């Protein structure tokens, strides 16, 4: 079986980050991020991971014509037939225009954003059964949820049993809270810098109490809502530097005035980071306890962009109450194509149990190989 899985959907016009592709050829797995082949983490002009796709064809010695299934995230709208024609007939030449309708019906599969997170975590673990929770900033336009949780079991025909979910319409969540905290500290969307800065700070109980007031609890609807009114930011086109270009730096001013900035006004940045991180840890553990209070599972898997935070993960490992806790090597969007591909492989009866893929396990860093001549050509 040959599978190509792409994130984001190359024909859905929405801006996404962490473009990646996974290809499976029988037992071989190729899974990689586009940024690693471009040398640029952020490229606002890219629509899909074309370098990673082409290198995957080379690595696995396959072509677009002999792919059994193409997997994409659920799009935000119905894709125009002419766009599919360009992609599959004109560009990749995977099929003919005459056979395109049948091709789309039989060979093109869609998986929702948070389910893809779930499958990435589960299939890269060695668990046969586990509770699992996915939390991020808000999915994408084809899956406008910020949380999904339930139980996943290899022996169940439907695989994943949903316990609950929270939609973006319910308001901002803990993922957005950490984003706002990061923006306040002047790091834009580089959340890892907030976590790093926290290691130099101290907990301030007064600040902790005031930050917690920004949250509204509604456990009957399985929701913690974060509220932070922010003023409009100003563009900064006069400061553009073409050699270090990132659109976000010129479309908004970071930080902006907000309820959060007023609360944190007289505190040191490192103490804001430390106190904010501790609150995030406490809120996340509280949610896990509430969502799985009736569960008898011994294992927990945490996925979604929120769990790129290693300090949070360490705290959960110690405080969750589960015997084993697993965090995938890429809990954020860079692992989505892998989850979608492995899900399809499982549904076609090709995965019997969660076996590791070599010493490093199944992960989204199984990229292209380069011989010595190719390396020399790159360096020269």
Q: Locations of the language-model features?
A:
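Short acidic/glycine-rich loops and adjacent helix/strand connectors
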Residues: 1-380
């Amino acid at each position: 079986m040959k599978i190509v899985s792409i994130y984001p959907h190359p024909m859905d016009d929405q801006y996404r980050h962490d473009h990646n592709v996974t290809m499976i050829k029988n037992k071989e797995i190729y899974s990689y991020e586009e940024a690693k082949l471009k040398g640029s983490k952020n490229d606002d002009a890219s629509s899909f991971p074309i370098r990673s796709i082409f290198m995957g064809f080379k690595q696995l010695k396959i072509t677009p014509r002999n792919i059994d299934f193409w997997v994409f995230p659920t799009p935000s709208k119905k894709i125009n037939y002419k766009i599919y024609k360009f992609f599959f007939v004109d560009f990749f030449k995977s099929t003919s225009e005459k056979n395109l309708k049948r091709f789309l019906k039989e060979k093109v599969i869609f998986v929702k954003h948070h389910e893809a997170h779930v499958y990435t975590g589960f299939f890269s673990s060695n668990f046969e059964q586990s509770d699992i929770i996915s939390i991020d900033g808000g999915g994408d336009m084809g899956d406008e949820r910020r949380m999904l949780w339930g139980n996943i079991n290899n022996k169940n025909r439907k695989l994943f049993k949903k316990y609950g979910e929270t939609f973006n319409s319910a308001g901002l969540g803990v993922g957005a809270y950490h984003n706002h905290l990061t923006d306040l500290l002047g790091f834009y969307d580089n959340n890892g810098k907030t976590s790093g800065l926290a290691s130099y700070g101290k907990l301030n109980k007064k600040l902790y109490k005031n930050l917690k007031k920004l949250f509204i609890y509604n456990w009957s609807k399985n929701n913690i809502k974060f509220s932070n009114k922010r003023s409009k930011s100003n563009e900064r086109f006069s400061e553009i530097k073409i050699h270090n270009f990132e659109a976000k730096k010129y479309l908004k001013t970071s930080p902006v005035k907000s309820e959060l900035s007023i609360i944190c006004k007289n505190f040191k940045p490192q103490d804001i980071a430390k106190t904010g991180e501790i609150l995030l840890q406490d809120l996340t553990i509280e949610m896990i306890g509430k969502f799985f209070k009736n569960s008898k599972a011994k294992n927990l898997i945490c996925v979604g962009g929120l769990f790129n935070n290693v300090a949070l993960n360490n705290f959960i490992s110690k405080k969750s109450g589960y015997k084993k806790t697993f965090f995938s090597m890429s809990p954020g969007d860079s692992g989505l194509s892998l989850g979608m591909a492995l899900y399809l492989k499982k549904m076609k009866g090709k995965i019997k149990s969660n076996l590791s893929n070599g010493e490093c396990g199944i992960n989204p860093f199984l990229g292209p190989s380069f011989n010595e001549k190719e390396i020399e050509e790159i360096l020269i």
